């Protein structure tokens, strides 16, 4: 609607022209932009490192298992505080969640965490059969639990929006709105200093 284009490509490197315009190399193209934003969730650190900005982004890995066909056992999400897990009824069955770790992007799935989720679910519902699906997701996490939103300290035409922890879907839209206004030179009337990458200098 606004003249943008969606392209699904893997970003490999980011460099800058003599006039500090971002040059982005993907797996299939080379692009030069007036301005660019790194908003790649847990995968953002690779690119922020390339522009010599050491932001201490880590990867909080969350797990879930799925029991197909047992959604009739619950009518609403339940948190079992004593054992530290939750179960949510889905259209396709029950989703069991409740374990995280700092494990990076490349380490394999930790089977002990899957077994723990399965055992906890069967403690609550002994009638559960074999689970159908195991999932591992990556949450971009920073030491102070605040995202990075705003310009790079090293390049005036590069901006950041990542590190939203468990709230990426929740805060992504408002972060994008704030950042787009900032890039366009609009007055946001917000104090964004707590979200600046400068706090890690």
Describe each model-derived feature in a short phrase:
Residues 4, 123-127, 184-188:
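Generic secondary-structure signature for well-ordered alpha-helical cores
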Residues 7, 37, 159-161:
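Hydrophobic/aromatic beta-strand patches that form the interior of the parallel beta-sheet core
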Residues 11, 131-133, 191-197:
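Beta-strand segments within the central parallel beta-sheet cores of soluble alpha/beta enzyme folds
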Residues 13-16, 21, 30-31, 35-157:
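Active-site substrate-recognition segment that forms the wall
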Residues 18, 153-201:
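C-terminal lid/capping helical subdomain adjacent to the catalytic/cofactor pocket in oxidative enzymes
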Residues 24:
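A Rossmann-like FAD-binding core segment of flavoenzymes
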